Each structure stands twice: as C-alpha cells, then as structure tokens.
Amino acid sequence: MKAYIGIDNGVSGSLALVVEDIAEFRKMPTFKEQSYTKAKAQITRVSWMDLDILLAAWCSRPYDHIRAFIERPYMNPKGFKATVSALRCLEATLISVERAERLSYEYIDSKQWQKVMLPKGCKGPDLKTASRDIGCRLFPGCSVAIKIHKDADSLLIAEWARR
C-alpha cells in the first residue's frame, strides 16, 4: 500500500495524508514568538517539533512506500519579508521531513497539481475557493477541517500524487 503526503508549505499551510480511500488533514503546526528583529512584533513559525511527531506517526504505519510532495514556496524578489518568511518555513519543514524515517520527498510547483485538480481559468482568490469546494467534495470526512482552514491544498496535492 502506498501513502502520499501533501505539504502546503508555510505558516498558513497544511499537511495531508492520502492512502487509497483514507485521508487525514492537519493545519501546519505553528507557534508565535517575539520577532528576531528589534521591532516590537510577533512572528509565526513552523513548529518543527510538532511536525516531527506528526510525520513520525504517519511514517510508522505499515505502508509499503510513503512519499511527501512539498509545494515549492513562491518567491518574490520585491517582497523581501514574505520571501524570508517562506524560506524560514521551508527550512523548518525540511528538517522534519528529512528526520522522518522511510519518507522520500520531492518538490512540486503549485501549477502542477492545480492544472489537474482545479477548474481551468481559476485565478487569485478563486483558487482557494475551488480548493475548498473540491476538497470537501472529494474528502467529505475532512470537510469540517477544510472549511475551518479555508482550503484543501495539501489534500489536493496528495490526491494529485496518488493519481
């Protein structure tokens, strides 16, 4: 039996496990702390320790093969702060993924899975709406969590990989 993990990277992202007709959906584990800058500000970080625990639990199950598909973060040279945040999140996620036993992984671009899983012509805010609606339709057991999170990107990534 093969298992697929979809990772919608970032502090507002999520993780999903899809195995045949079983699906699990979790929001990315995060925590807030004082910013590393001198400014009086809070930053949100990925909790690699909690992510370690979740991935270890998923990888300890008796699957023949388990692979993670990590969405490559969007980089915008004009948006320095957002780019730094995306890279910090990616690094924390990679630490946990690389520590998980038996877990192979690869990077994917959002367009790869969106082209297959979402309707043609979706752009901007419509992408999240379509993700939520399609995720609820394909994975009704996860619909409450999807609606709270407002999208099902990680589930759709994992389902795209499974197909």
Regions found by a protein language model. Give the residues of each.
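Phosphate- and other anionic-substrate recognition elements at nucleic-acid/protein interfaces
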Residues: 1-163
